[in-house]
Amino acid sequence: MKLVAILEDDAASGGGYNQALNAILQMRDLCAGRYEFEVLTTRLSNIGVLRSLNVQAEAFAYSIADKLLSYLSPAPWWHPLQVRLRLVGPFERMLRRRGCDLVYFVTPTARPNMLQGLNFIATVWDLCHRDTPEFPEVRESAVFQAREHSYRTILPQAFAIMTDSAALAGAISRRYGIDAERLLPMPFAPAPSLSAASSTDKATVLSKYGLQEGYFFYPAQFWAHKNHIRILQALVQLKARGQAVSVAFAGGDQGNRRHVETFVAANALRDQVRLLGFVPAEDMRGLYEGCRAVVMPTYFGPTNMPPLEAWLIGKPLIYSSQFREQAGEAALCVDPDDADALARAMQACSDDEICAALVRAGAARLRQIEQQRKEAEAELLARLRQFEAKRSCWP
């Protein structure tokens, strides 16, 4: 049996890209000695990244015909016509020529709607367009409608659906009527690029960005839902109390950076706030190592990667209270609406005993999640074996 993983994102996509890399590495290891496994990517830049992780990949591009199939997929009349005409797009024909039995889309995507006959594994990271539909990134440009159509048409067809948590799996089942046995919660893991061997040393990184140790660190792209503003409001409160702490934001602009910059200027925070922009993977470990604590008051979840990475590096974590299921006792959990609560949590991180307790709890929580991942991997392998048995029933 042969599986083919499809990677459509690149490093500029943020944390989701690292999770996609983890998914590829995980499936490669599960398939070793059991099944054939290939990786195809739509981004040439991924070839070198994957090679550095000992994964061989090939680049491809969706054809105009493939994109047309994807464009037509929302139309209720299209699929019956496609079946009647036996139309199979170039993407699926290419996969069949390669002997592919099961396609693994390692990021959320509407591309499974291109497939006429091949089975696939889908990925869902969140349902935040339903949880918090007021944010512009899911409210504007028909994103909400596109996600709803994608999930309603793709998920019922999937052989398996990879999610990041039991909470998300339950929400998918409840909202879209998906059978629970089709869903497989697979906990996230820290980014593979955070290993010391592939990272630039802390001193070099801090010098590069002009940072002094002891800042609060938020690795997140500038989306509205990332809630950078609440951190800045907390800085204003702390400054009024005579505590001028600093924060470093690392992430590309997704339309909300100017809003953050305007607030920084209006509240005289330029000396306390560093906007680092997109940071290459090899610098991330050094930025984590140099911080006092990681702060993440995001509205989107139910899980995120920076908490895992804070625990891996051994840093205290301040996290949104609605995602306590991921954090357990390993974070100071605050209401992301409440700047005062966030300021108090940041102030608490000046206490070495509190920080040490959070670091110990983080290490323990990471071990728990790693055990959950091992159990989920065993379940994934069992499901692949079930698919293999069924796949033997046709040529």
Describe each model-derived feature in a short phrase:
Residues 1-395:
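Carbohydrate transferase catalytic cores enriched for Leloir-type hexosyltransferases
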